[in-house]
Amino acid sequence: MIPTRCNEINGSRPSSLKLAGESHTIKKTSSCKSKPRPHGRASPVIIYAHSPKVIHTRAEDFMALVQRLTGLDEIIRRNTSESSSSVVTEEVNVGDDNTAAPFSQDRTQRQKLTDMPLFTPSSMTLFGSPTQLMYMSPNRTDSFRPLVFKSE
């Protein structure tokens, strides 16, 4: 049965195509010739539909602000908006004025600060570190005391 297949493959072929005399080859123009492109991808161009907003908030209101802007549940959003002091402003032509007011160190401001680490501790940093980690603020008025971990 194999010879029959060979005969079919090696059988007669159709005649080759012939081109008309007025035909010519088409050459595609390269976009690289018109302007040189740097290697890699071109950086994206950001076009804003609206001017970006500058949001001013206190450190203790930051989490509530992020949750409000990212779509927290309406009931929780109403409760946090009563105590939030975040201000949304639009700043146009902001200069490089570095004369910011110094951080207020009065007693009311210090009471709002908490003694929490600004990193997520792993078990290694929690039990392998000689430093103390405070998880509750000592400025709280309730009967709880701060929880302190100290490795010896």
Curated annotation (Swiss-Prot):
KW Lyase (keyword) present: no
Reported consequences of knocking out the gene: Pale-green and stunted growth phenotypes.
Residues annotated as signal peptide: none
Short motif (VQ): ranges: 62-71
Chain segments annotated as coiled-coil in the UniProt record: none
InterPro entries assigned to the protein according to its UniProt record, in alphabetical order: VQ (IPR008889), VQ_8/17/18/20/21/25 (IPR039607)
Domain of life: Eukaryota
Alphabetical keyword list: Chloroplast, Plastid, Transit peptide
One term under GO cellular component: chloroplast
Record: transit peptide: 1-58
Pfam family, one: VQ
Localisation: Plastid, Chloroplast
Keyword Thylakoid: no
Biased composition (Low complexity): 81-92
PANTHER family assigned: F16F4.1 PROTEIN-RELATED (PTHR33143), VQ MOTIF-CONTAINING PROTEIN 8, CHLOROPLASTIC (PTHR33143:SF76)
Task of the protein: May be involved in chloroplast development.
This protein's name: VQ motif-containing protein 8, chloroplastic
Gene designation: VQ8
